[in-house]
Regions:
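HIT superfamily nucleotide-processing domains
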Residues: 1-110
Length: 110
């Protein structure tokens, strides 16, 4: 475990997209973000900020992607709500324009 508070915790992803990829999860088992309490949302955001500071120091990324997959149609593969905090590095992909919009390639450019 990387970081923890009363309602959430952060750990490195077992299958990282990039060096330093962190997952932020609720302590309580909740399948969907929209079923979390306001306190759990705040607890996860607190850890996102703390993890970002840690990653800035350890990995010095050039940017971040932050996201949640809600439901199978959105790519959720783990039935426990979690944020992905993904460090990004200059040159780590050919064309990062559009960021998370790239999940649907035809919508990446706008």
């Amino acid at each position: 475990m990387l970081l923890e508070n009363a309602l959430a915790y952060a750990r490195y992803d077992d299958h990282p997209v990039s060096p330093g990829h962190v997952l932020i999860l609720t302590q309580r088992h909740v399948a969907d973000y929209f079923d979390t309490t306001l306190a759990e949302k705040h607890a996860m955001l607190e850890l996102i900020e703390a993890a970002r500071l840690l990653l800035n120091w350890e990995y010095a990324p050039d940017g971040y992607n932050l996201g949640i997959n809600c439901g199978a149609a959105a790519g959720q593969s783990m039935p426990h709500v979690h944020y992905h905090l993904i460090p990004r590095y200059q040159g780590d992909m050919e064309n990062p324009r559009g960021g998370v919009r790239g999940v649907i390639p035809d919508r990446q450019k706008y």
